[in-house]
Amino acid sequence: MRLLLLSLALITAHPAAAIRARDFGIAPGPMPTGPLNAITDVPGMAVGQVTLDRGDTIRTGVTAILPHAGNIFAEKVPGGIFVANGFGKLMGLSQVRELGEIETPILLTNTLNVPEAAAAIIEHTLSQPGNEGVRSVNAVVGETNDGGLNDIRARALSIADARRAIAEARPGPVQEGAVGAGRGTIAFGYKGGIGTSSRRTPEGFTVGVLVQSNYGGRLILAGVPIPPPPGKTAARVSADGSIMIVVATDAPLSDRNLTRLAARAMAGLARTGSAFSNGSGDYAIAFSTANSVRRTAARRAASTAYPELGNEATTPLFIAAADATEEAIANSLLAAEIVTSREPGTDETRRAVALDQALIRRLLATAGQPAR
């Protein structure tokens, strides 16, 4: 029974190595990556994931992103959100835009489990020492609709699952592909999922990105068009869908410049062939982990301003965000494996195929970009 239960909820805190974009020579931009080429290269960052594979219909999960290891409510981080197309249900959006700060872990999941993820964030926040008097929590939860592979109406993710993702969040490598909130997602007709990347700017700052890819258009990798899956034409691959992009940096930015940073993630998204369609939810959340700009009660009482980088220092960070987003999306697709499920109430098998790695290598080589 214990082995069965473990198979139902796979915790992905200690990932194995997977195929990544750089294995194909895909390395957008001039800047180097951090040691892990992941969002967790930003100091203090942690990621936790719970993947749910239940029976032949449940293919979903949750991914937790923690800006720092302390009490996030007591040490809020400045943040900004950019929306390219708003067909989505990003919880917490209005208060982040109004106040320019994030006070909770960020959770990503499927559309119909946003309430459970929010409840987990609220329970986690209220349970933290020092938060005994808290009466308002702005839970930030992003989502994409994984109903193409997952029985989304079953709302399989529990509050306990989401709390476990928060509790299991760790620094270090981040598993990519069909895991966590990316278990049931599809992008460009292929299996999508979780992907991450990072950049180090010449000034010594780090920008890290994590994506949950579940969107459409015509796939482009390193400037090379990639054909749709076998048996499908470009016209039959839906342009709809969504993507959640989380951008973290240790640069001490204001919430206004973090909103600008979030906007630059869309440049990376566009390079991958996104349609930005009517039915797409294209969201980017950006925040700074720099201790000097954290919003604490003591700092609010003692000062009216925080030491932060000026506008003229943002360009390298903007470039880093775009490049890391492009690579994170490529990683989400290249790391994903084939996922199958059954259409609820029928015997119909649903299947999302992975990118054909041999084909990708040939196409890149033909375009003059041979794999490393």
Residue ranges and their predicted role:
Residues 5-13:
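Bacterial N-terminal signal peptides
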Residues 1-3:
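Positively charged n-region of N-terminal signal peptides that target proteins for export
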Residues 17-372:
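Alpha/propeptide regions of enzymes that mature by internal proteolysis
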